[in-house]
Amino acid sequence: AKLSEQAERYDDMAASMKAVTELGAELSNEERNLLSVAYKNVVGARRSSWRVISSIEQKTEGNDKRQQMAREYREKVETELQDICKDVLDLLDRFLVPNATPPESKVFYLKMKGDYYRYLSEVASGDSKQETVASSQQAYQEAFEISKSEMQPTHPIRLGLALNFSVFYYEILNSPEKACSLAKSAFDEAIRELDTLNEESYKDSTLIMQLLRDNLTLWTSENQGEEADNVEGDN
């Protein structure tokens, strides 16, 4: 898996880490991060493609042939994206969440569950969208409650969860006030306890705090109604 990462062959890396996960033992922190990086890159490529193709599809209105080609290609990418998300969610439900012992592992995997349901909801419609949105919110909320009671406000996993949960509120639920409130609370609580940061996680934590602040600036700016690429990070 490490070799695949160095070669940037993320599909191979994901397949390796899926096989490791299916052995059924609790993953080490390093294995957990390799799994996360692999699937984040695999699904990220499809999410980017889907956005580009959807934009092209909208621009080809009035040109039936080109629009049909764009729609068929979008549906192909959509199926790939859905299959990847379902793979990850299956691993989370069957192995990762049930086997997670430390609170930080439980939060990490529940956050991941929220993320992959969120990715599904981006391409879903109708009842399917409602279900994926509800599942995403439920996973994020459960992770959020554990993180508040069991982890320091400066912990990079807790901060990463707050970042992605706030993006969920902004992009998926269209609730800018809730998104800003959540991001601001996470940032302010971390700032107050900055002196508790250990050297090991200082870089990760401060990077996510910067992303939280960037999103807050973007969301509260005068241009908040305009389409903008929201900064989003996973840890």
Swiss-Prot record:
GO terms for biological process: protein localization; signal transduction. SMART domains: 14_3_3. InterPro entries: 14-3-3, 14-3-3_CS, 14-3-3_dom_sf, 14-3-3_domain. Belongs to the 14-3-3 family. It comes from Xenopus laevis. One of its GO terms (cellular component) is cytoplasm. This is 14-3-3-like protein. It holds the Pfam family 14-3-3. It comes from the Eukaryota. Adapter protein implicated in the regulation of a large spectrum of both general and specialized signaling pathways. Binds to a large number of partners, usually by recognition of a phosphoserine or phosphothreonine motif. Binding generally results in the modulation of the activity of the binding partner. SUPFAM superfamilies: 14-3-3 protein.
